[in-house]
């Protein structure tokens, strides 16, 4: 199985550098300044100069890495398109992939899974300069839940480094809003102290509270999108558990048969001992006569 593609290190918003250590100008001008203190001040100034060179090289490296990533991002596009065309031939590919992913499956309720059975295509598009953000598109067939054919969510990073997001408004059909139903279900469950289902997967499209820490978006972009096949092919855990239980049952049956055989051997041994004792008794009676 092909390894997951690791995203290149992209330029991060510049963080203000800590203020340089105060120079001991007044003391250095004094002829009576201790030698050790003067050497320490000179070392601090030289460290600051070297650090400036390191920062300059880091910025240069980030720019070059970004250019390489932009180049290969364009080269990958035809292959992503070809992969999408092939995936379209496999029914329920994306819902299976999401259900098999441990982090995404934790966000899926039963009705979410039903709705995702109509999901036919997923696309992740990084903006041309890459560092400013990306968009995730979900394409759906006609379904009983909402009118939209495409649901999208975009993530942006402005020049100051502040993240933000925006998404498609979901046009729910009458009585089919899974986000409201999820909230009602959780309220009932909490009152009855029953197991609470996770918040609906579709609330992700309306949640813009912390775009900089959107785990689902990052999982889809960095983990699932580079190689969704690895999650589609994950063995069904229920099947594995069933096979394990069958193996345990077979082992128990074999152990039971072995116990029966051992008990049978012991019984036969006891019968042989009884027969030997009987024969010895008859011989003793004959000698007495």
UniProtKB/Swiss-Prot annotation:
Modified residue annotations for N,N,N-trimethylalanine: 2
One Pfam family from the record: NAP
Residues found modified as N6-acetyllysine: 23, 67, 149, 171
Localization per record: Cytoplasm, Cytosol; Endoplasmic reticulum; Nucleus, Nucleoplasm
Single GO molecular function: DNA binding
Biased composition annotated in UniProt, kind: Basic and acidic residues: 35-45, 168-180
Annotated segments matching region Dimerization: 31-77
Biased amino acid composition, Acidic residues: 236-289
GO cellular component: cytoplasm; cytosol; endoplasmic reticulum; lipid droplet; nucleoplasm; nucleus; perinuclear region of cytoplasm; protein-containing complex
Region (Earmuff domain): 78-224
GO biological process: negative regulation of DNA-templated transcription; negative regulation of neuron apoptotic process; nucleosome assembly
Signal peptide: none
Oligomer status and interactors: Headphone-shaped homodimer. Isoform 1 and isoform 2 interact directly with each other and with ANP32A within the tripartite INHAT (inhibitor of acetyltransferases) complex. Isoform 1 and isoform 2 interact also with histones. Isoform 2 is a omponent of the SET complex, composed of at least ANP32A, APEX1, HMGB2, NME1, SET and TREX1, but not NME2 or TREX2. Within this complex, directly interacts with ANP32A, NME1, HMGB2 and TREX1; the interaction with ANP32A is enhanced after cleavage. Interacts with APBB1, CHTOP, SETBP1, SGO1.
Name of the featured protein: Protein SET
Organism encoding this protein: Mus musculus
